[in-house]
Regions:
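Sec-dependent signal peptide recognition
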Residues: 2-8
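Outer-membrane beta-barrel channels and translocator barrels
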Residues: 42, 94, 148-153, 208-210, ...
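Outer-membrane beta-barrel biogenesis signature
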Residues: 19-47, 60, 258-275
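N-terminal signal peptide c-region/cleavage motif recognized by signal peptidases
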Residues: 15-16
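Outer-membrane beta-barrel architecture
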Residues: 40-48, 82-86, 96-98, 136-140, ...
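Residues on the lipid-exposed face of transmembrane beta-strands in outer-membrane beta-barrel proteins
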Residues: 49-53, 87-91, 101-103, 141-145, ...
Length: 275
């Protein structure tokens, strides 16, 4: 009887040990924290640069002839086209709104005009030929609406307010009799420079070149208001232009700071351990 009890106990112990071995669970592998990786987000700030060509339309010019009470229009007044170069800094507020401050320079644009009056000892009717040129520096605050992104393209419209510093060179005036004969000596009027109010309207599209570089191609209409043009000399002047329109085609690029997101590191799972 005792042997039977001992045998039963031995069998029970062996069964318990076997069951414990079957349900043994290994200790979990130690948790290894992945290295911290920061995802770069676009800050919104960007730099821009542009080159363009401006088709200029002078609205006319006028001057005082003989006295300060006799304001006369030029018979003709034309301003040639010029190249532009510009740069700026801006901020992208969201997917649709952005704004920037820009500074543009328009290269020398030649002026050709004519006036009608009297000249010579007679005096006789004369027509004067007038030659000058201008350059312009423009500072603008602009706002844009991006009209959605289609593939790599983002069309936009915008507008800006600011001022232009227009610098006229000396104006050379040569009067010649309408009936023919010797012309008067050329008279030089000192050029004027001044700040004027200006506004502009824009439309164009940007093209994604990389994650933080966009090409920008567009059209810009600018109206620069009237201002002083030249001073008094030899019983003529001063004179002023009536402002001018600029129709500009430009191309450039925008560089966004922090515009490239970094991929998030995901560690591979640890292999399962079986016993």
């Amino acid at each position: 009887m005792k042997m039977s009890l001992f045998g039963a106990a031995a069998v029970l112990f062996a069964s318990t040990s076997a069951f414990a071995a079957d349900v043994y669970q290994p200790e979990p592998a130690p948790f290894i924290d992945a290295p911290e990786v920061t995802v770069s987000e676009a800050s919104g700030w960007y730099l821009r640069g542009d080159l363009g060509y401006s088709f200029n339309d002078l609205r006319g010019a006028e001057y005082f002839q003989g006295s300060n009470s006799n304001l006369v229009d030029f018979g003709s007044a034309k301003l040639k086209n010029g190249y532009t170069v510009g740069a700026g800094v801006g901020y992208q507020m969201n997917n649709y709104l952005r704004g920037d401050l820009t500074f543009d320079y328009m290269t020398k644009s030649d002026f050709r005009g004519s006036t009608n009056g009297e000249c010579g000892a007679g005096p006789v009717a004369c027509t004067s030929s007038d030659y000058s040129s201008l350059t312009a520096y423009t500072l603008m605050a602009n706002a844009y609406v991006d009209l959605g992104t289609y593939g790599y393209f983002t069309p936009y419209v915008g507008g800006g307010l600011g001022g232009s510093y227009v610098k006229w060179k000396n104006l050379n005036n040569t009067a010649c009799p309408d009936a023919g004969g010797a012309c008067d000596d050329t008279v030089t009027h000192g050029g004027r420079g001044n700040w004027r109010f200006a506004y502009q309207l824009m439309a164009g599209a940007s093209v994604d070149l990389t994650c933080n570089v966009k090409a920008d191609v567009g059209y810009r209409f600018r109206h620069t208001l009237a201002g002083g043009m030249f001073g008094y000399a030899e019983n003529g002047g001063p004179g002023r232009d009536k402002g001018f329109y600029s129709h500009e085609i430009h191309a450039g690029a925008r560089y966004s700071f922090g515009g490239c997101d970094q991929p998030v590191y995901t560690p591979e799972p640890e292999p399962l351990v079986y016993k």
